[in-house]
């Protein structure tokens, strides 16, 4: 009788492990923050280059950044969001712009 209980405990533990492994990953919003110095054309370039937006959608998001102070560029897993933030910030610095890209939990 003890062996049956051991098997059920193992089966329950295995199901819990599988359930935990199948949980969707945490998601993060990547956000561009407005400043008074970065040209609008550069923001559009960033949105096209790093987020694959067409010129129309990139322009809409650039205007949201400009008038609302910030805009969400996309929602990604932690690793992808962190990479995009780092790449955008590096690109902005390389081009001598103070544009800031951040992330926050979705």
Curated annotation (Swiss-Prot):
Pfam families given in the database record: ClpS (PF02617)
GO biological process, one term: proteolysis
General function of this protein: Involved in the modulation of the specificity of the ClpAP-mediated ATP-dependent protein degradation.
HAMAP family found in the cross-reference section: ClpS
Record's subunit section: Binds to the N-terminal domain of the chaperone ClpA.
Protein family according to the UniProt entry: Belongs to the ClpS family.
Protein name listed in UniProt: ATP-dependent Clp protease adapter protein ClpS
UniProt gene name: clpS
């Amino acid at each position: 009788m003890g062996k049956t209980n051991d098997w059920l405990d193992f089966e329950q533990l295995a199901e819990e492990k599988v359930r935990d492994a199948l949980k969707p990953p945490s998601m993060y919003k990547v956000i561009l923050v407005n400043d008074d110095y970065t040209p609008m054309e550069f923001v559009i370039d960033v949105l096209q280059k790093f987020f694959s937006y067409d010129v129309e959608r990139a322009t809409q998001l650039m205007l949201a950044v400009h008038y609302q102070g910030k805009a969400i560029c996309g929602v990604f897993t932690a690793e992808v969001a962190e990479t995009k933030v780092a790449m955008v910030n590096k690109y902005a610095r390389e081009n001598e712009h103070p544009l800031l890209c951040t992330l926050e939990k979705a």
